[in-house]
A protein has these predicted regions:
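A general, composition-driven signal for non-globular sequence regions
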Residues: 1-3, 21, 42, 55
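Compact, glycine-rich, soluble single-domain proteins
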Residues: 29-161
Length: 161
């Protein structure tokens, strides 16, 4: 009679652990998809609006645009950081060439790295502390006129109208 009681308690303990653990999996960073938002780029030809996925958690920033096979010209991914710091990126498991636009805390472009090599493990670093990185399909930074000093507007930078 002792064994059924122990087995019952063990089963109850396992169920309790699973009940406590499963909601964390369902709502953890790894399970969430990036939210989509808009940015406005002040270009020489006028304001351009782009749709961007927001990568604002460690898990979303780590995954980035990995495993994607295409990125529309009117979209990108905006990596947001709590504090300005030197940022290092790479192209591991990223199948499409990208332009990386490093952004200061006020939303101005610090520098642009163009034509990154898909799946490369080379480190792509910002030359100065930045608060965000905008990734676009390769060639789009030039098409949009993104260069040092260009303003990118988004509520994160406190400069959205």
């Amino acid at each position: 009679m002792l064994y059924p009681r122990i087995r019952s308690r063990a089963l109850g303990l396992v169920l309790l652990i699973l009940i406590a653990w499963l909601p964390g999996i369902a709502h953890g960073d790894d399970a969430s998809a990036p939210r989509v938002d808009s940015i406005v780029i002040d270009t020489p030809a006028g304001a351009r609006m782009l749709s961007v996925e927001i990568a604002d958690t460690p898990a979303l920033r780590e995954r980035g645009l990995m495993f994607r096979h295409r990125l529309p010209d009117d979209s990108g991914m905006l990596f947001l950081y709590e504090t300005a710091h030197p940022v290092a990126m790479w192209m591991k498991n990223t199948y499409i060439p990208l332009d990386m636009v490093f952004l200061r805390a006020d939303g101005t472009v610090a520098e642009v790295k163009t034509g990154t090599v898909p799946q490369s493990l080379d480190v792509i670093e910002s030359a100065e502390p930045v608060k965000a990185v905008l990734e676009l399909s390769s060639g789009n930074a030039r098409k949009l006129g993104l260069e040092p000093g260009t303003l990118v507007r988004h509520p994160f930078f406190g400069n959205a109208d």
